[in-house]
């Protein structure tokens, strides 16, 4: 999801409007419950992706950017190589298990460290709470960042938590110390 967010932040205007296709509704795992035909901005989808870990948001961004999940995965792999991620291969934008989808802590740290240089990415991953529209409801979706480090570790600046049965609990985090931003 870190690389997905980086690519979206690099190539999209945050105010671009994305119409949610049927293929991005009901995606397995964590979700913001996107609805077919719903319109959200790229920035709203980034908040859904990085705060709520919305797999549906990941696929919506992938389809918006590349036309399909498979084509977006190709773009992810190309970008990962450009960033020096030598031991990674991506098959989807959300990180759900697939035998051909893998990475390492070192590669994720390289990607995350670079991504923090993108102002939109940094803004999104450092946000503790956001509201995004929900057209079919009288209220907005309220998203609380799952990264508890933001409130429990002085100087924490964000990034991403994760969980799958196969990988277990995962965390890539960043923190400012002595005028340096550390990623681990």
Name each model feature, range by range:
Residues 68-183:
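Penicillin-recognizing serine hydrolase domain
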